[in-house]
């Protein structure tokens, strides 16, 4: 009798469990494979992405990086209508500061830095005379004379605008990738949104500059440098909208701020293809 009772009890338990599983499967919750996945997972090639789309009363939250939820340490800039959603407007002596560009420098051998910008006419230094402006820079303790390990200069007017990218590696060797002199670019500072992508290939040691999805024919190179090899440990700040130095009240060209608008700032640890860059432009990303 005891064996029969145990068998009945076991059978009842199995029946209840089976019914429970069946009822769970009929619920409206999606199966595991149906849950949406983040297209930009933290371990992917997109290492830093600030859309500047926040509309809260907290400016640090409005400038958050979407990859690692890396909030800005400081954001004194105004939110404006961007090329897609919201963007930011740079002002004299002000910029957005992050403690790090996440792990971008740790993993980048090749890289792509892409963003949208809007600037009307002649670039100015912080005292109002003609001079360079910086969409971004990495402040660094690497000992480089500039105080940084990477920065981008946009300088000139709508008729002739120079673009200059400086990179210093772990050994404090540096290189300038420039489009200046006879290779300046017209039409960049016309108070309209433009997309810029800077693509470094470790295979060629060259940087391809894309404007609105179109590659510039001038591809400056860094000899046979290969992997970019930036010292991640020495990066002390990622600055959006300023050079790497701190002499803000002077005409110091390394301390000048960006006085236009910016949106969709992205940093990849790979060299995007032309098709990838064109997709960013076409999608206003």
What are these language model-derived features?
Residues 20, 24-93, 234, 278-285:
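Extracytoplasmic low-complexity segments
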Residues 115, 191-200, 209:
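Short tryptophan-centered beta-strand motifs in secreted/extracellular beta-sheet-rich domains
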Residues 219-260:
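Flexible glycan-contacting loops in extracellular carbohydrate-active proteins
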């Amino acid at each position: 009798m005891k064996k029969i009772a145990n068998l009945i009890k076991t059978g009842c338990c199995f029946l209840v469990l089976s019914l429970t599983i069946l009822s769970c499967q009929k619920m409206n919750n999606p199966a595991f494979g149906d849950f949406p996945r983040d297209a930009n997972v933290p371990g992917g090639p997109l290492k830093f992405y600030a859309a500047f789309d926040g509309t809260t009363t907290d400016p640090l939250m409005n400038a958050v990086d979407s990859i690692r939820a890396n909030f800005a340490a400081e954001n004194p800039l105004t939110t404006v209508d961007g090329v897609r959603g919201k963007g930011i407007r740079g002002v004299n002596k002000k910029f957005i500061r992050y403690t790090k560009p996440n792990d971008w420098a740790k993993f980048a051998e090749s890289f792509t830095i892409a963003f949208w910008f809007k600037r009307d006419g002649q670039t100015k230094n912080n005292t109002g005379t003609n001079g360079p402006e910086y969409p971004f820079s990495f402040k660094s303790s690497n000992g480089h004379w500039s105080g940084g390990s990477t920065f981008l200069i946009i300088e000139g007017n709508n008729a002739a605008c120079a673009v200059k990218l400086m990179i210093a590696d772990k050994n404090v060797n540096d290189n300038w990738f420039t489009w200046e002199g006879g290779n300046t670019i017209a039409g960049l500072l016309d108070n309209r949104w433009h997309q810029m992508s800077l693509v470094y290939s470790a295979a060629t040691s060259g940087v391809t500059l894309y404007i609105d999805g179109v590659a510039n024919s001038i591809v400056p190179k860094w000899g046979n440098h290969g992997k970019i090899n930036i010292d991640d440990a020495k990066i002390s700040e990622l600055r959006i909208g300023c050079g790497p130095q701190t002499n803000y009240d002077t005409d110091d060209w390394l301390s000048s701020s960006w006085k236009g608008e910016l949106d969709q700032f992205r940093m990849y640890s790979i060299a995007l293809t032309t098709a990838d860059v064109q997709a960013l432009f076409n999608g206003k990303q």
